């Protein structure tokens, strides 16, 4: 064969040489250059090499396939031998065999081993089928058996014996589980009897085979379900037992509280007897059933409603007691204001009646404790408020024009006024003492002292502010009246007093001509006697002192003005005597007039002076069109100086500011008649 191959190669080489020579001749005829010839020869050489390489590769792949098949066959032979028990299987190949002959020998040996493996698998499958059946009944996992049957990795006789021993164990476990199922079913039946549940319905829900004793399922899942069912029923039993025991305790408490007759208690005797029993001791049928518990609950609810009704009555009484204490002590209790502390809160279920009763009791104790600490201060507050009421009554009394009219009970009113004045004089000290007490109480307890929801210190502060404003206003009025009295005194000293209207019906005396002429001449100021000026200035000073003394005495004594006093008795309107200027000085407006009460001038209050002096409808003002220049009159009588020139126009209006208000001066009747206005 080698010789034939060599001859074939030489023949091919001869053929290739002939073809190459023919190709060179053609190239010569064509006139190809040497470079072109070399390039063409290189291409031919490459093409030949590629053909050889392709053939070599195909032959190599064929050899590799044969080697692979032989290797696979030998590997399968080794695997079967290993799975059959680890026996060593020798190869039956001979020396000098080619690959195809070797592959044929391997295939023959492999067929024999496959037959032996199939026979072994039949024996294994019989045991595995029984294992699978018992595993399914017991609920054991079967994945490893299915995997073993599919893989067939271990078919040794030792493995077969192991599977047979597992089969025996599963058979024993099945018998034990049957006994366990019977025990669980018995326990479940007992629980269902106590709880009043349907036993057959419950086990049928777990597995239908449990009803029939011949074909009961003994799988682990069934046992677990039975165990879970028993656990749940025991928990339900414990819960119901606890509930029944709580209801029994509530029944006993309500019976003792409401004095329930013994005949009604006998109905629930079995329930009350179960208070001290344990879970295992309660075996009476249907004692923990839903219907039995519902019956006990209804009884407890009925008795609880009666109890709540009585508690509501107690709460209402407690609230009334708390309201009475709070009202007497003028305290604002938050419990009474809150909606959660009312009977409606109990009815709506927001508050527990007993809890609310305890809170009200604690609030009553708290209020009583606080009331004891507030008692002394409250007495002082009530005294202060009573004094304030007397102060208000005294102010109203002083404004009454008819307070001194003789009548029934007038002397009692006067006595009350005197007592009120004494009490009002004590108000500043009373306020200071009360403020100190309240401040100390608040600092000690850390809370505000409230009186009917208002802080007492705020009330005292407001009272102080109002009192200071009143005092300031009174002082301003006194200053105004004092200044007004001085101005009126100066006017009367210069021009005489204004005559009062004739109320007796008699014709007034005519003024002497000389006095009238002297007053007319006083317009120029040159003919006014110096003696008259001195007398009037002296009298003016006396009148001012007298008026100030009377005003001070009236202010200190706080005597009200008399009702029914005449207009002629007011300062500035007192009628002067019709005497010559040089003969007599003008009389003081505070001197008593004939036929007038002794205390009429003394008791005249500054308010009456101010009111009459400023009555715009009755006074006669000097026209301001004749004024050329206003000049302020000095406030002291000694500073009054008469004009010395007759041609100088008279300055009728006097301007004096007091607290930014104009004081308007009134003129006497003689001045009006003389033409000053």
Curated annotation (Swiss-Prot):
* InterPro entries linked to this entry: MAP65_Ase1_PRC1
Q: Name one Pfam family in it.
A: MAP65_ASE1
Which residues are annotated with the PTM Phosphoserine?
500
Question: Domain of life, per the record?
Answer: Eukaryota
The GO annotation for biological process reads: cell division; microtubule cytoskeleton organization
Q: Where in the cell is it found?
A: Nucleus; Cytoplasm; Cytoplasm, Cytoskeleton, Spindle pole
UniProt entry keywords in alphabetical sequence: Cell cycle, Cell division, Coiled coil, Cytoplasm, Cytoskeleton, Microtubule, Mitosis, Nucleus, Phosphoprotein
Q: What induces it?
A: Cell cycle-regulated expression with higher levels during mitosis.
Question: Which PANTHER family does the UniProt entry name for this protein?
Answer: 65-KDA MICROTUBULE-ASSOCIATED PROTEIN 4, PROTEIN REGULATOR OF CYTOKINESIS 1 PRC1-RELATED
**What name goes with this protein?**
65-kDa microtubule-associated protein 4
Organism expressing this protein natively? Arabidopsis thaliana (Mouse-ear cress)
Q: What is the lineage of its organism?
A: Eukaryota, Viridiplantae, Streptophyta, Embryophyta, Tracheophyta
């Amino acid at each position: 064969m080698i010789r034939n191959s060599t001859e074939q190669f030489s023949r091919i080489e001869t053929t290739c040489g002939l073809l190459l020579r023919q190709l060179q001749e053609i190239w010569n005829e064509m006139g190809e250059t040497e470079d072109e010839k070399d390039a063409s020869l290189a291409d031919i050489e490459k093409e030949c090499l590629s053909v050889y390489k392709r053939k070599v590769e195909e032959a190599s792949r064929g050899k590799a396939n044969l080697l692979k098949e032989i290797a696979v066959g030998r590997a399968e032979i080794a695997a079967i031998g290993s799975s059959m028990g680890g026996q060593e299987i020798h190869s039956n190949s001979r020396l000098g065999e080619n690959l195809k002959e070797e592959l044929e020998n391997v295939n023959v040996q492999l067929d024999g081993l496959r037959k032996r493996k199939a026979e072994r698998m039949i024996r294994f499958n019989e045991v595995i089928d029984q294992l699978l059946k018992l595993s399914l009944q017991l609920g054991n996992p079967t994945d490893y058996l299915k995997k073993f049957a599919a893989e067939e990795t271990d078919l040794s006789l030792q493995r077969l014996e192991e599977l047979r021993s597992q089969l025996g164990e599963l058979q024993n476990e099945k018998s034990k589980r049957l006994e366990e199922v019977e025990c669980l079913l018995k326990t479940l039946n007992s629980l269902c009897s106590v709880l009043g549940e349907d036993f057959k319905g419950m086990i049928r829900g777990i597995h239908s085979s449990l009803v029939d004793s011949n074909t009961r399922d003994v799988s682990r899942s069934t046992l677990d379900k039975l165990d879970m069912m028993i656990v749940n029923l025991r928990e339900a039993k414990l819960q119901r037992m606890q509930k029944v025991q709580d209801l029994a305790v509530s029944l006993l408490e309500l019976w003792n509280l409401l004095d329930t007759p013994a005949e009604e208690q006998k109905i629930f005797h079995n329930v009350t007897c179960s208070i001290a029993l344990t879970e295992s001791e309660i075996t009476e049928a249907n004692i923990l059933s839903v219907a039995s518990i519902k019956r006990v609950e209804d009884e407890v609810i009925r008795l609880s409603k009666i109890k709540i009704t009585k508690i509501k009555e107690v709460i209402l009484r407690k609230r009334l007691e708390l309201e009475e204490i709070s009202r007497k002590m003028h305290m604002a209790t938050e419990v009474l204001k809150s909606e959660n502390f009312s009977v409606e809160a109990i009815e709506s279920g927001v508050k527990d009646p007993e809890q609310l009763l305890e809170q009200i009791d604690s609030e009553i104790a708290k209020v009583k404790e606080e009331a004891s600490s507030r008692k002394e201060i409250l007495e002082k507050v009530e005294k202060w408020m009573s004094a304030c009421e007397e102060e208000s009554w005294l102010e109203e009394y002083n404004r009454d024009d008819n307070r001194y009219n003789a009548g029934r009970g007038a002397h009692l009113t006067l006595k009350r006024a005197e007592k009120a004045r004494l009490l009002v004089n004590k108000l500043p000290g009373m306020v200071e003492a009360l403020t100190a007490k309240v401040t100390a109480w608040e600092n000690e307890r850390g809370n505000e002292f409230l009186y009917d929801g208002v802080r007492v210190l705020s009330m005292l502060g407001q009272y102080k502010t109002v009192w200071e404003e009143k005092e300031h206003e009174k002082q301003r009025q006194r200053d105004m009246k004092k200044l007004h009295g001085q101005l009126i005194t100066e006017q009367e000293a210069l021009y005489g007093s204004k005559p009062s209207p004739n109320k007796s019906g008699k014709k007034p005396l005519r003024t002497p001509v000389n006095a009238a002429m002297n007053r007319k001449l006083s317009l120029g100021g040159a003919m006014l006697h110096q003696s008259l000026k001195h007398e009037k200035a002296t009298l003016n000073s006396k009148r001012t002192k007298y008026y100030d003394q009377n005003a001070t005495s009236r202010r200190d004594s706080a005597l009200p003005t008399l009702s029914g006093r005449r207009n002629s008795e007011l300062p500035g309107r007192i009628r002067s005597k019709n005497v010559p200027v040089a003969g007599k000085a003008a009389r003081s407006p505070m001197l008593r007039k004939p036929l007038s009460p002794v205390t009429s001038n003394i008791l005249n209050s500054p308010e009456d002076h101010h009111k009459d002096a400023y009555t715009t409808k009755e006074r006669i003002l000097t026209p301001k069109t004749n004024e050329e220049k206003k000049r302020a009159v000095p406030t002291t009588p000694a500073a009054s100086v008469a004009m010395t020139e007759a041609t100088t126009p008279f300055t009728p209006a006097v301007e004096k500011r007091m607290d930014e208000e104009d004081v308007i001066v009134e003129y006497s009747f003689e001045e009006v008649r003389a033409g000053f206005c």
